Regions:
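Conserved ABC transporter NBD signature motif
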Residues: 46-56
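ABC ATPase NBD coupling module
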Residues: 57-71
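Conserved ABC ATPase "signature" region
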Residues: 102-120
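Conserved ABC ATPase signature
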Residues: 124-128
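Catalytic Walker B motif of ABC-type/P-loop ATPase nucleotide-binding domains
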Residues: 149-152
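H-loop/switch region of ABC-family ATPase nucleotide-binding domains
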Residues: 185-186
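Conserved beta-strand-loop-alpha-helix hinge in the C-terminal portion
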Residues: 205-229, 233
Length: 242
């Protein structure tokens, strides 16, 4: 598996190539959990249990591997961009890892084509829309070819059209590149069709996990309020007796 979190409150595994949607009420700990999966962003404090990355304790994974293999996209498009040119932003992570120039050029070209960035490749980052900036963040992370891509409410500051386009690109990444995706997202109607697995949190604990269909059934059986927040198609499916 790509990730395994072990503990009395949170037993969860993310297999390679999975698309996991993590959901739950506001303040239940989703962002805190995601940051535990990226040590450079993890909050300070005492952690119980274990987090494994490719069957190795996460704290024993060297920083270079963490930087390259664990991608993270934050909520605000502004918080992650560090250069002033689109092309340089695509190359920055690879430069920081000491990647050779021919490889940087090849990967940047591949990402520009994959994400449709060619038309604004040489533009200033300041000229981009919020949707373009977030797409650039995503492309910059993917240039390092991560094994897992973690996204914390990446569309929260995007307009509906840009958000739909962004989520469609995530589905393409998962299908065509086989990258595991762990996503928290409030637009569940659009995120759930992409999911191979769903995990629901409540008050810092894992409430239930499984396929979208299984989670719908579990929430209905539990009578939990999160059932009403699920996409309409899931609620209808879970309510039909079999």
């Amino acid at each position: 598996p790509t990730y395994t979190a072990e503990g009395t409150e949170f037993p969860l595994t993310v297999p390679e190539g999975a698309f996991l949607v993590l959901c739950g009420p506001s303040g239940c700990g989703k962002s805190t959990l995601l940051r535990q999966l990226k040590p450079a962003l993890a909050p300070h404090g005492v952690r119980q249990g274990r987090i494994l990355f490719r069957d190795a304790p996460l704290e024993q994974v060297d920083q270079r591997t963490q930087a390259a293999r664990i991608g993270f996209v934050q909520q605000s498009p502004e918080n992650q961009i560090v250069t002033d040119k689109v092309w340089h932003e695509l190359a920055f992570g690879l430069e920081s890892l000491g990647t050779d120039t021919p490889t940087i050029r090849r990967r940047v070209a591949e990402m520009a084509a994959f994400f449709g960035i060619e038309d604004w490749f040489y533009r200033d980052v300041a000229e981009l829309s919020g949707g373009q900036k977030q797409l650039l963040n995503l492309a910059s992370v993917m240039a390092m070819q991560p094994d897992v891509l973690i996204l914390d409410e990446p569309t929260s500051q995007l307009d509906p059209i840009a958000a739909s386009d962004f989520l469609a690109v995530l589905g393409k990444i998962n299908r065509e590149l086989g990258t595991a995706v762990v996503l928290t997202e409030h637009r569940l109607e659009e995120a759930f069709p992409l999911a191979t697995a769903v995990a629901v949190m409540d008050r810092g604990r894992l409430l239930c996990t499984g396929t979208p269909q299984q989670v719908g059934r579990q929430l209905k059986t539990l009578g939990h309020g999160m059932f009403l927040a699920m996409p309409a198609a899931m609620r209808i499916w879970a309510s039909v007796d079999t």
